[in-house]
């Protein structure tokens, strides 16, 4: 359970882009199902692929798309809380380079996704749903792009739910 027993991977044109490692557990305080994220890994040399995927999702960042996919999975299986590892909580600190600089700053990303450090300082508590701006909040020049992006994200959510439901039968 160091990084996770399960993973969700994001591919574009048959090539892996991101992988998120996690495990399922029961919340110690209320017994509800939770997900603990142990790691989020991106590609070594995937800049062109990332650009392609970002374009395919109308400007939505691939790292955010990966986390959105996990949120869709969590909703489909009835998870009510998601906890994401902090930089300090990451067991191996493998994301620290030889020169001691972070390769990946988990904290910055989780905070960007509205995560808040919880009482167990090794984890952020993450919202299970992503905030979407209303069309009125967006510049008129960005509305069509966001409408297409949200439609694509809704397709992804439906596909994840259908895949999970097929295993429930």
Per-region residue spans from a language model:
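Acyl-donor binding region in acyl/amide transferases
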Residues: 18-117
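Active-site/acyl-donor-binding loops of N-acyltransferases
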Residues: 86-155, 159
